[in-house]
Amino acid sequence: MELSIHNWMRSETLETTIRRIAALGYTKLEIAGSPEQYNTKEVRHLLQQYNVSCWGSVTLMLGERNLLAKDEAQRARSVQYVKDVVRMVKELDGHMVSVVPGTVGKIVPEARPEEEWQWAVDSLKEVYTYAEESGILLGIEPINRFETYFINRGDQALALAEAVGPKCGVCLDSFHMNMEEADIYDAIRRAKGRLVGFHVADNNRMAPGMGHLDWGKIVGTLREIGYDDVLSVEFCSPLDRTPANPYPNSLDENPKDLSPEQRKFLEDHGSTAVTEEFYAMLTRKSYETLSVLL
């Protein structure tokens, strides 16, 4: 197995991120699903310069992005967005795209269950066909009930993947699993054969090793089902503005170049902009916890 990490949490240049993770020993990057922000030729050059490769990307389902929207035109725009993410990953020689079907933060349905299910299937089939032609895997990611009402558990993601296509996969996330699964390890086992990605954060969404999850057992279960690809670090530190914050210098009160989209994404995840020192600590802690298990 290898270690990858996201870059959507901190507002900094991509080179700053890549330089940091390369120095620590990471070999992969899971680039933010913002294809409009990146010149893929320049990104490829940076990755090659620091001997890091693109693992894939994760969709940022903000605003009107919703593959199961009631409005057909909205669904079409959302499909095109995910295709654009797939294209970016293809141009970066990546491997997979993790897809959250619905808008993050939307917890109220707008149609009957069977309607939304069919809209999601139809939208994902279109993306799946495009991804397969591009040689990129799709992984449907379940996230917790406080961020979406649609797909929360591995079994739900598996059912959707099976409805979409034979090579459509799932991407599990330890933080969400800790909230939604009766048994994390059984959920991993049931994903055997369809697991194309695995996001890692501890139960409190801090870096692995800063909570109570059993990382040795998680990695062992992944090996048990034959998953030997990439663990993608995706911590997202919780917002703490109280005197009880154990990391008083963690909040970046004046972040530079934080886009409205990135700010909204962090807020939807109960987080905020963090300082370079704190972010580097989380990145380092993740590597130290996981690298010895691989």
Q: Model-predicted segments: where are they?
A:
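Histidine-acidic metal/acid-base catalytic patches
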Residues: 1-2, 11-22, 151, 158-168, ...
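Hydrophobic faces of well-ordered beta-strands that scaffold small-molecule active sites
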Residues: 1-7, 29-31, 54-59, 97-99, ...
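Active-site mouth loops of central-metabolism enzymes
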Residues: 1-13, 65-79, 109-117, 149, ...
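Active-site-proximal loop/turn and secondary-structure-junction residues that shape catalytic pockets
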Residues: 9-11, 35, 60-63, 103-105, ...
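Acidic (Asp/Glu)-rich catalytic clusters
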Residues: 16-23, 37-58, 87-94, 125-134, ...
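Glycine-rich, proline-tolerant flexible connector loops at the mouths of alpha/beta enzymes
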Residues: 28-50, 58, 101-112
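Short hydrophobic interaction/assembly module
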Residues: 47-70, 74-75
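Active-site acidic/histidine proton-transfer and metal-coordination neighborhood
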Residues: 48-49, 72-169, 252, 257-268, ...
